[in-house]
């Protein structure tokens, strides 16, 4: 039986998460505990899996043994196959097992065979899925294939947490563009530098470490030519594990700039996002000065703002977060939704979404 309990549903599914005429599925505490474990496992693949989603899977055999798997780098096995392989390596009996996966298993041939084939071949009896995969090549087909193969399938356990974890992937697959994260660092009164232009460093080492984590989670990083000329940044990943993102400069970078090799872009930002999305960039991190930040912001192109605030004041006419004119009236204020607030050493990180 295919049971639906998610906002990510195929057609003909009621708003409360189950098919019309069908009783709402019963969710067990154990299901939520094991899906929470799968979410934790998925996080270990966050910096390595792109352009594939970072997925976690947990296999529970009929005698209670548990095995985990996360998405390997592109071209390697997906989370479900990795978890099944771990069970086999331990000599576990998979017939009648339950498999938990944060994302719908794929049912198509890509760089790897379909995960649904591996699940059915193993004799798994029940599959619990966090959310449906909006990728047009999947989009519910994996769930239907599992059901037709004899699996009991439930969708929607811990759906909100998983949708948050996979937000860049989901955005990319539904829009064709990367998820844009604008990182900003400022004093409490919103100043990004002193009057003389000096800005190193407003925030603490802990906040700067977080910036390197954001870089490691992104497949591309963007700045403006003005920032390159002023600061000559490398825009690489340091202090944390992860690969360097592809570097993008809006405008022309000096020939001897540390940011090379990079993509130099001289065109509409919308076109840049279209290109990067087509090339498999799931998340674009923007680290720039106030002019380029304002262009992304006022163009409605930012999906998430990550603001690092130091407990300091600059005052006066020191440079602010965005160049250009601000809101003329209170009614013109841009307002977002606070996702999280946390301490980074002496600083605050405030994450806001559109």
List where the protein language model places each region:
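Short, compositionally biased "basic patch" segments
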Residues: 58, 83, 87, 176-185, ...
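Active-site beta-strand termini and strand-to-loop segments that position acidic
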Residues: 61-62, 174-175, 353-354
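Proteins enriched for Cys/Gly/acidic motifs involved in redox and nucleic-acid/cofactor modification
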Residues: 48, 76, 143, 157-185
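A structural motif shared across PLP-dependent enzymes of the aminotransferase-like
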Residues: 47-50, 54, 75-79
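Zn2+-dependent cytidine deaminase-like catalytic core
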Residues: 58-161, 246, 295-297
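Enzymes that bind and transform nitrogen-containing heteroaromatic metabolites
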Residues: 4, 8, 12, 18, ...
């Amino acid at each position: 039986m295919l049971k639906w309990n998610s906002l990510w549903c195929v057609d003909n599914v009621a708003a409360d998460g189950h098919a019309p005429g069908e009783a709402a599925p019963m969710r067990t505490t154990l299901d939520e505990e094991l899906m929470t474990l799968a979410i934790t496992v998925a996080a270990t693949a966050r910096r390595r899996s792109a352009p594939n989603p970072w997925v976690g899977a947990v296999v529970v055999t009929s005698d209670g043994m548990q095995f985990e798997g996360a998405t390997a780098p592109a071209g390697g096995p997906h989370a479900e196959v990795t978890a099944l392989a771990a069970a086999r390596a331990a000599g576990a009996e998979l017939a009648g097992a339950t498999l938990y996966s944060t994302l719908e298993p794929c049912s198509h041939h890509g760089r790897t065979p379909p995960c649904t084939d591996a699940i059915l071949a193993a004799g798994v009896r029940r599959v619990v899925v966090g959310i449906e995969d909006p990728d047009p090549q999947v989009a519910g087909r994996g769930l239907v294939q599992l059901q037709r193969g004899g699996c009991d399938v439930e969708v929607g356990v811990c759906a909100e947490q998983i949708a948050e974890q996979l937000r860049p992937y989901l955005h990319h697959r539904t829009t064709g563009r990367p998820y844009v994260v604008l990182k900003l660092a400022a004093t409490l009164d919103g100043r990004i530098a002193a009057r003389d232009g000096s800005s190193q460093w407003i925030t603490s080492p802990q906040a700067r470490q977080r910036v390197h984590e954001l870089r490691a989670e992104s497949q591309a990083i963007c700045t403006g030519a003005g920032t390159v000329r002023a600061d000559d940044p490398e825009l690489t990943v340091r202090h944390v594990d992860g690969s360097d993102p592809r570097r993008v400069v809006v405008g022309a970078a000096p020939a001897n700039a540390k940011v090379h090799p990079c993509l130099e872009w001289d065109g509409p930002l919308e076109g840049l996002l279209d290109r990067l999305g087509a090339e498999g960039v799931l998340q674009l991190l923007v680290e720039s000065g106030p002019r380029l930040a304002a262009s992304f912001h006022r163009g409605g192109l930012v999906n998430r703002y990550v603001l690092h605030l130091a407990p300091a004041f600059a005052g006066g006419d020191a440079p602010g977060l965005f160049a250009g004119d601000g809101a003329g009236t209170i009614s013109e204020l841009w307002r977002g939704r606070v996702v999280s607030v946390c301490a980074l050493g002496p600083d605050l990180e405030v994450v806001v979404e559109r």
